[in-house]
Amino acid sequence: LGDFRLNHPLDQSYRLIFQHILYNMVEKEITTANVGTVVLEEKDYQLAEITVKGERPQVKLEGGKLTYDVPQLMKDKTATNAFEIIKDLPGLIERNDNLELVGASRLNIILNGQLTTMSADQLIQLLKTMPASRVEKAEVMYNAPAKYNVKGALLNVVLSKNESEIPSWQGETGVDYTQYRHAGGDAHVNLLYTNKGFSIDFLLNGNKRRDVMGEDMLARHTLNSGMTEISQHNRALVHVNRGTVRLGMDYTFANEDKLSLAYYLKGDKVLSDRDAFTSYLDLSKPENKSESTSLVRDDGHSAIHNIRLQYDGHAGISAGADFTRYHSPSVLDYQDTNTNGSRTDMINNTRQDVSRWSVFLNKTHSFASGWGLNYGVHGGYASSKNYSEYLYEQGAGYEMDEEALEDNTQKEYIADIFAEVSKNFGERFSATVGLKGEYFKSDYASSRENMNLWNEGALFPTVSLSYTFSPRHILQFDISSDKTYPGYWQVSPQVTPLNSYSEVAGNPLLKPYRTYEGQMVYIFRQKYMLVAFCEYTPDYFAQLLYQSDTELKTVFRFENMDYSLEAGLAVIIPFNVGRFWNSRITLRGWRMQEKNDNFHGISYNREAYLGLAHMSNTFNLCDKPNLKMTIDGQYVTPGAIQGIYDLGSMYEISAGLKWTFLNDRASLTLKGDDIFASSIPRTIKINQGNQWSRMRKLNDERCLKLSFVWKFGGYKEREHDSIDTSRFGK
């Protein structure tokens, strides 16, 4: 209803009373200068047996963006962090900690509209450390404006701002207990200081957990006109310790220009102990049977440092610079003993060091005629140094295998220039057309060879059209394209053994892939959505398993395909049953096709028809005490494919109970995720040409979580940034 300020010294506690003819009265006891956001509940009016109820729109179209009022949508949810809030937005689907937007190939995420070099994965990890109370609004774009320096779909998470004319300290702290197969925990502290145009925020988060991983495999490997049956049992225990620190400062000048400086540090230590039991049976000579036992310990850690400076001017100018440093050494101790008398004792030392710079300059013009112009430039440089050595026990100590030594450097240069024009044609029709030109060069150098991986330019046109039949009926159409490059380790020719039969290998011949996609979105009554989508990706790559034709090994490696093609429809249906039950149903059906004419001696052209059903439910059990319950479910039909993989069905059921108390300053939440341990395919099958195997995955995603959160000083969080590490690591 508005922003209010009382110019009165706060020398004692006060009681504020909020009253409006259309809303229920709210009383609030305050002891701090910044009250934060106060949400009023709408009244129901009964007039002569006629009940008139007000309903807020689920979604609005603002400048080509689908805008969601997050506090209103999520006020009764049991979410305890920002990620849990975001993943429940209409049209978003969460799978194994990854967010998908219905009808989009990939979803980029930014905070408060600021340019960022962080990947979606890294930003998701950061959102998990933020309180849910921080999220104020979410903006979804199927076709991101060029000024954001991302291509394709974009989710802009707008976080609440705490501006105060007098010095103010606020904060939140919380602890989580998590029970997977083993117990774990998480703790966080967020502090914010504001004074007129200056603010400083601090985030500290730490977590510790142990994960159980494993696979059971049955394979029939054809080699030299013979067939060997391999039966394998893998189990691993992974210890993870992780910490995050973020310090940010913002200053707003009198003319509304804003200067932002942020430092981000994330460090983790991962210790994995894996054992595997493998049996080999020659089907033509059953007497030729052998068994091996593999013990693998992988001890590694990583650290990411990021510093970012950005200036946003009131005249439409944005400029900034970003630097990221990544360091990740690891030691792998591999021992394998076979009943045929062979034994392998090997140590694999690896190290990756990445330095990346990025600068940008954007300018926006808004003309009185209704036209808008946005243009800018972006430049970047990255250097990745990858090192891998193998030492084998030969009876007199460990000796290095000089031929297997890999020491390479990959340097990248990138330059972008873009222009974008927008126009509102009356009150109904609006259009945005943009073009980005990109030059990308990557050089690879090692002790064996020097080569140019990629040296190419590309154009990325974008079109966004929207037509408003009425404020409650909107049609939107988007066309965009994107390009995805492999990770640094993925093109490095190193090999990492998993056990006596399986290994992970790099692919120096891996190529980037281009994506072309389009969406048509119809919004009915500002809450129901119908989405039609199509996506074509030539040279698409994914990690696939194949059985070697030169040795008895199965290899996990990223491989290019000829193309991937998907097209389908989705519908989103929200509904309420009084104040007690709030629900949303998402239904999606699509056709997928993947083709490859040369995959290790075989070819495939595969298609599948799939369906997805997702339902989220919130129940308002009672107001005093304030108890809310959520039950969410998702089901994916069997038949999904990835290359030569056949994936089984997946479903997930989660439930939670949240108690809010101490005048909404504290909450206690009990939640069960993936209750039936069924969120990943139970079985992955391969039966293409001479490739045959069955793999059953062990699921350790089932979790019981108990969370306590306490806010002090009227805390409402500020924005945090992170870094793109999607191409770092193995």
Residue ranges and their predicted role:
Residues 13-29:
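A short, solvent-exposed loop/turn motif at the edges and junctions
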Residues 2-8, 125:
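Short, surface-exposed beta-strand/beta-hairpin micro-motifs centered on an aromatic residue
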Residues 356-358, 511, 517, 530-589, ...:
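Outer membrane beta-barrel strand-and-loop segments of large Gram-negative receptors
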Residues 44, 49, 55-279, 294-327, ...:
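Membrane-proximal, glycine/serine-rich, low-complexity loop/turn segments characteristic
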Residues 152-153, 159-175, 243-247, 268, ...:
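Surface-exposed extracellular loop regions of Gram-negative outer-membrane beta-barrel proteins
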